[in-house]
Structure formats: structure tokens, C-alpha cells
């Protein structure tokens, strides 16, 4: 083992492995990752691993969209599944204030090109029968919502 590296990454969780991955994509070779156990065996392994592109901050939304696309790219490059499951997701409103907020957010997401759309209570219940329709005013559907398997 070498005694000197240009970069040493401490921790092989999602952040450490992402740093190492991106450095190697930039052509860096004088780098090392140090992990005390198995890769992703710490807090990353216990994560819910859910993600979405919805965020009113365009920078955060761009980062979240980049992450979703990166997982797809890694699967394609490696031929290995990351356990990605992208069924989409709903944010629902049961109060007039929440419904107004979702409508305003929808307009922001439209300008960001995210592709989220407002949905009726009937659409939500048809897709998610476990949701009680009583008091449901509507919702916002995000087609880019899903999860990956953090330990597989």
C-alpha cells in the first residue's frame, strides 16, 4: 500500500463512494478510500433511500435530478442493478392551505421542467386505494419519485 495519495476519502458510505466515483470519472488515479468495515455498512445501509426531483430551489432540484439520472447511468455502465424502483409519488392536501401551497409549488415545478402535475382526489384514490378519500382536496404527482436498495 502506498503511503501518500493526492486524496484520501474517509468512509465508504454514499458520500464517500460518490466522491471517489466522481474523482475517477475526472481521471484522478492517485486516490484512496478508507472504510473500517464493508462499503455502505454504516448509516447508508440503514437509509430509506428514497428520492424525488421536487424542490422549489432550482439548484437542489437539479442536484436531485442529477442523482436520479446517475443511478440509471451506473446501472447501465456496470450491468448491476441498484434496486431502483421509480413508481412516482403523491403529495396530498387535506386542508385548503396545503392545497393552495401545492398549487403554487406546481407552478414552480412547471417552470423548472420537472413534470409534476396536480391531480384530483379521484385520481389519487384510484392509484392508491389505501388513501381515504374523505377530506382529500387533491394532490401533486411527481413521476420522478422512487427509491433504490441501499444494501443491495
Predicted regions and their residues:
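Glycine-rich FAD pyrophosphate-binding loop
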Residues: 24-45
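Helical element adjacent to the flavin cofactor pocket in flavoenzyme catalytic cores
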Residues: 141-152
